[in-house]
């Protein structure tokens, strides 16, 4: 059960100020420092803390050194600092960084920022709106209705999220069908493993719908940490509210395209910009002289709301609204008008006047859904006739979600548009191959000069060639011009390399050779075979994969408890294949795999996505062996710092997935040790005929060499 402990500190206040992801990161830095010189002093800290993301943008190493020099009354320069003192120093610097960035900012809502998942101050108004949203959309849920409605003024929300069911259900409300609800553990009382599985499923599924969860771990959700819970819920509600703001889902939006505007330019707009464009379209109709450019200050006087509602619902219009002299009075009249239109309140009049960005966005989105006022005549036939390459759309979605999951500073709304200046690609390349980018030669957005964009993209192509990507006749200008085929080709090679790099990082004891497709296939076949299952594949194009049975066998082989065979079909008809595929995606995420494919990719045997899914399962399985091996060899270090025994590489997901106990109740290291053990397989391949001998070296990949030989012979 050690996987649930996390990094524990004795001071409750310290524990509450940092997420488990932050604690693990800081703990690893502290342990590394201590291992270097035997102790950690103030003088050691500047060179380490300047590399921490939350501080690097605010301070240089020299500035940190000066700040730490001012702590002399609390610490001597040569004092041996313990971990908690180290954390206090970090928090001191973090507060100063926040003050330097602008003290007023840390109390304002940051939920509108795409990459935000951490908010250390709780906005009670926003929390109340989230609770009302949950009561409204999940009140009739067969499982949750026994716990709903929640009281907005209580802490019931934080208690209810602790078993993971509510968040999983909320993801399906935001993007229907994301989670196969058969994979959710919904007993009234869940054990710690079952709760952890739900949280792991939640976080991996949240990433798969576009949420940023880089600062959230399963332990944070299990504890119901308010700022993280609200940060995740706000992203899910925002995704739900903005889901229809695209031409693909609502062709009527083409009416917003102005005569001098390119349809392609409109397609590139993020949903928030489309919503503002829609609002200004109607305001112009109603004679409003200003242009609304944000969901905060431009709406504080409620005049824009009054004009908007008068255009959309003139039958409920009250002339006194525009004549009101007091902003608060006008805001109240606007809300009364909205209620007559059947728009439930997301905010109060005070919150309109205060300029709450998130609540205003939610309110405008609700008005849009209730009555968008757009034409339903032939004007939008062009949007309906637009032909889209379905596979291109799927690929763009997959790479967009993958990039956003990496934790880079930028956020991608549209791959083809957002990568054209080269900056995001440089950020991604640096994640895959740290240190490969020459940032001194890179230009950060906004970039006005076209040649600077070309320079960025040229560096991307140069690094790609150094990584041995297939980039024949590809130049940086091809990316700047938005060549979709070349962009998708580059991103596929980057995503594949990233996954193989993760696998390679676990092969250090076999001289770090590059992993090949054939080795991944051999590993998967062997894993299934040693468990006595009959399914095998020859390649990632094997048509038998469409039934889903091989992946279910593989998932069961790496962790038997995650697959409920009573829910599995024979995979013969199209409907049965889709049921299995949907279940596979959710089970893989529940296990701890960060995957972005769709069930259709399995049914149609999309070779690229099949490779990534198989490699993700392999990585998870081998990572558990690595964690077990490292925890046994470094238990003394772990006990001295109260660190979790489960380690995570810098590029792994932040879901803290812990290996569930196997069917036999034993740890996979001893009972299902396909990677660690030397296996003798009798001819009948039955489980009872397996002889497993312990490998004294506990090498997590001791059988990779034999797999490589098998692959070569094949």
UniProtKB/Swiss-Prot annotation:
Matches recorded under SUPFAM superfamilies: Calponin-homology domain, CH-domain (SSF47576), EF-hand (SSF47473)
GO molecular function: actin filament binding; metal ion binding
Low complexity compositional bias, start-end: 628-662
Primary location group: cytoplasm
Biological processes annotated in GO: actin filament bundle assembly; actin filament network formation
Domain of life: Eukaryota
Any Pfam family matching the protein: CH
InterPro entries: Actinin_actin-bd_CS, CH_dom, CH_dom_sf, EF-hand-dom_pair, Fimbrin/Plastin
Domain Calponin-homology (CH) intervals: 124-241, 269-372, 393-499, 514-622
A Gene Ontology term for the protein's cellular component: plant-type vacuole
Region (Actin-binding 2): 393-622
Location of the protein in the cell: Cytoplasm, Cytoskeleton
Keyword Protein biosynthesis: no
The UniProt record lists the keyword Metal-binding: yes
Known partners and oligomeric status: Interacts with F-actin.
UniProt protein name: Fimbrin-3
Species for this entry: Arabidopsis thaliana
Top-level taxonomy: Eukaryota, Viridiplantae, Streptophyta, Embryophyta, Tracheophyta
Name of the gene this protein is made from: FIM3
């Amino acid at each position: 059960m050690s996987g649930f402990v996390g990094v524990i500190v004795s001071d409750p206040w310290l524990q509450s100020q940092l997420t488990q992801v932050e604690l693990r990161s800081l703990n690893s830095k502290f342990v590394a420092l201590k291992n270097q010189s035997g102790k950690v002093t103030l003088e050691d800290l500047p060179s380490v803390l300047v590399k921490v993301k939350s501080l690097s943008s605010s301070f240089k190493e020299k500035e940190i050194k000066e700040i730490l020099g001012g702590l002399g009354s609390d610490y001597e320069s040569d004092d041996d600092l313990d971990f908690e003192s180290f954390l206090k120093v970090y928090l001191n610097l973090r507060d100063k960084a926040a003050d330097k960035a602008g003290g007023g900012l840390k109390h304002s809502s940051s939920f509108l920022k795409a990459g935000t998942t951490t908010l250390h101050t709780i906005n009670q108004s926003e929390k109340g709106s989230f609770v009302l949203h949950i009561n409204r959309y999940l009140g009739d849920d067969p499982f949750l209705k026994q716990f709903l409605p929640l009281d907005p003024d209580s802490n019931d929300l934080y208690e209810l999220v602790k078993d993971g069911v509510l968040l999983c259900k909320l993801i399906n409300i935001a993007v229907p069908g994301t989670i196969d609800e058969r994979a959710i553990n919904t007993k009234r009382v869940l054990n710690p493993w079952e709760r952890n599985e739900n949280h792991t499923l939640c976080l991996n599924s949240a990433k798969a719908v576009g949420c940023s969860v880089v600062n959230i771990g399963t332990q944070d959700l299990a504890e119901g940490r308010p700022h993280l819970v609200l940060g995740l819920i706000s992203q899910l509600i925002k995704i739900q509210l903005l889901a229809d703001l695209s031409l693909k889902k609502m062709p009527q939006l083409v009416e917003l395209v102005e005569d001098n505007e390119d349809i392609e330019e409109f397609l590139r707009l993020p949903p928030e910009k489309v919503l503002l464009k829609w609002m200004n379209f109607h305001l112009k109709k109603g004679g409003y002289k200003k242009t609304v450019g944000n969901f905060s200050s431009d709406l504080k006087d409620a005049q824009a709301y009054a004009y908007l509602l008068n255009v959309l619902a003139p039958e409920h219009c009250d002339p006194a609204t525009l004549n009101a002299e007091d902003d608060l009075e006008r805001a109240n009249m606007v809300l009364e008008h909205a209620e007559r239109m059947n728009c439930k309140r997301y905010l109060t009049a005070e919150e309109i006047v205060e300029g709450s960005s998130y609540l205003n966005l939610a309110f405008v989105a609700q008005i849009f859904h209730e009555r968008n006022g757009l034409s339903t005549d032939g004007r939008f036939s062009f949007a309906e006739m637009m032909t889209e390459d379905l596979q291109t759309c799927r690929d763009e979605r997959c790479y967009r979600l993958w990039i956003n999951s990496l934790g880079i500073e930028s956020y991608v709304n549209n791959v083809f548009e957002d990568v054209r200046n080269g900056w995001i690609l440089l950020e991604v390349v640096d994640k895959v191959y740290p240190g490969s980018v020459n940032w001194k030669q890179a230009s950060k957005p906004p970039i006005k000069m076209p040649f600077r964009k070309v320079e960025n993209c040229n560096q991307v192509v140069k690094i790609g060639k150094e990584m041995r990507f297939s980039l024949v006749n590809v130049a940086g200008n091809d990316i700047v011009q938005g060549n979709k085929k070349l962009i998708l080709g580059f991103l596929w090679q980057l995503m594949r390399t990233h996954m193989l790099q993760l696998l390679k990082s676990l092969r250090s004891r076999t001289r770090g050779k590059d992993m090949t497709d054939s080795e991944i296939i051999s590993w998967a076949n062997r894993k299934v075979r040693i468990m006595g299952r009959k399914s095998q594949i020859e390649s990632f194009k094997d048509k038998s994969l469409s039934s889903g049975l091989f992946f279910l066998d593989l998932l069961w082989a790496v962790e038997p408890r995650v697959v409920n065979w009573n829910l599995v079909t024979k995979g013969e008809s199209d409907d049965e294949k889709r049921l299995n595929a949907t279940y596979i995606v959710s089970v893989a995420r529940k296990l701890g795999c960060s995957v972005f494919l769709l069930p259709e990719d399995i049914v149609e045997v999309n070779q690229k996505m099949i490779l990534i899914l198989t490699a993700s399962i392999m990585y998870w399985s081998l990572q558990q062996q690595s964690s077990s091996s490292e925890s046994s060899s470094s238990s003394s270090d772990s006990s001295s710092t109260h660190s979790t025994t489960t380690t995570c590489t810098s590029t792994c997901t932040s879901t803290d997935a812990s290996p569930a106990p196997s069917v036999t109740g034993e740890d996979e290291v001893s009972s299902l040790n396909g990677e660690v053990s030397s296996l003798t397989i009798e001819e009948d391949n039955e489980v009872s005929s397996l002889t497993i001998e312990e490998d004294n070296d506990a090498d997590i990949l001791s059988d990779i060499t034999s797999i490589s030989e098998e692959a070569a012979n094949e």
